[in-house]
Amino acid sequence: MDFGHILKSLVGMAKSDIEKKVEQQQTMSDRIVVDAVEVVEPFDFPPVDPGSIITLEKPAHFRLKMKRFTQLGSGNKRWYDAIMDVRFDKGFKTNGTSAPKIFNLQVPAYIAMTEKNANIYNAAAFIHDGLYACKGEIEEEGVPNAKNSKRRYTLSRIECDNILSEIWRKSDFVDSLTAKIGELGVNLFAGGEEHWDNDDLHCKTSFSAKIKYLK
């Protein structure tokens, strides 16, 4: 398969066509928009070659201000404001493989920590890898219209992919169209059993995510 040709074809598609494909896929689906990314505790790892396994030498913590379109309780689907706290323990490992390799030239899995906004950009693939390894399982707090306001919940693959491209956009390292192309590539090429619920690097025990809904 000529992956280079596939990449060029996708990049060459009109912006409206890309947006239409993603919109069609997400129609009536739960989805997430990230408004801001706060670096609470930055990443700390030594320089590595592309494709190598990264091991965090210190804990890291990121906070996402977000909107989530979903159904909570017995109400209809609507947008909810929320904060998502994502924590990585020391020793968390990732190689960015939940994002397809054919897009690495256009949207690299991670960038050198010396680059501008590297923490935010790298958080995209790191969080995505963690969510995929956990099969989207997170904690929820402050759940409206629910008897128990705290619970375990599973994000859909589309929501996890939303988070990936939304953080890419917030990093300003790639433009909105390129981020959307990257998300489409994840939808098309990285969605099977090979990555979803794949914890080959044993990062489930060193990754956690919690969404807190705002009143």
How would you describe each model-predicted region?
Residues D2-K215:
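Extended terminal accessory/targeting regions
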